[in-house]
Amino acid sequence: MVSKMNNIQSSGEISQHKAAKIAGIIFPISIIILMVVNLTVVAPLIIKSNPSETARNISSHEFLFRIGIAGNILYSVCEVVFLIALYTILKNVNHSFAIFAAICFMINSFSWLLIAINQFTVIRLLNDIGFSHSFRPEGLFAMVRLHLIGEDIYYIGLLFWALGCTVISCLLLKSRYIPKSLSVFGIISSAWCAGCTFIFYIFPNYANVINLWWFDSPMVLFELAMSIWFLIKGIKTQQPEPA
């Protein structure tokens, strides 16, 4: 009986170590995908002050725009893999909180699917002759611009991402799977992101006080550092405290 219990525990530890390696690989990849497709592929096509020029850019570079859509979908898939890996690592620390964090990450992942769906709608609006006959050019361009406003969806997802990351950081602090200082930085940066995002919902001009890049950049740096630690150092499964 004791031998069987030891085998089960050993199997669980192996799963956690594998999950840590997966998390260490998948998050940096997902961030690279997200940054490349949105900052270097999609962003140059969108001119916020000129919807008609934006529509022409997308029509002329539809292949690039579709690469951006595919990248957002791939990022969403990577996020699901990442949250499963984190849940596997932390479920023995506190199952309920690990589930909550996974749900938060799932909502963030879903937000990127919504952005991708809106981008597909843009292509449909521009390519379907029926739409060009139903709307005046100004109206069609306005519809295109409306579906390209992914910031609102992003910042809704960001709040849940930050909440999930805050919980993850607390569980990592409790488990001591990573250095205490790194866990504390994760708690502070994630709570900061959640707070800034929520204030931004109510006071849009808050972005004039705190640059939007400062909302999530510290949290992303934490997750990158955590991922590198998982990949290089792994986790010490003998140390976590019972929930």
What does each model-identified segment do?
Residues 2-243:
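Hydrophobic, aromatic-enriched alpha-helical segments typical of multi-pass transmembrane helices
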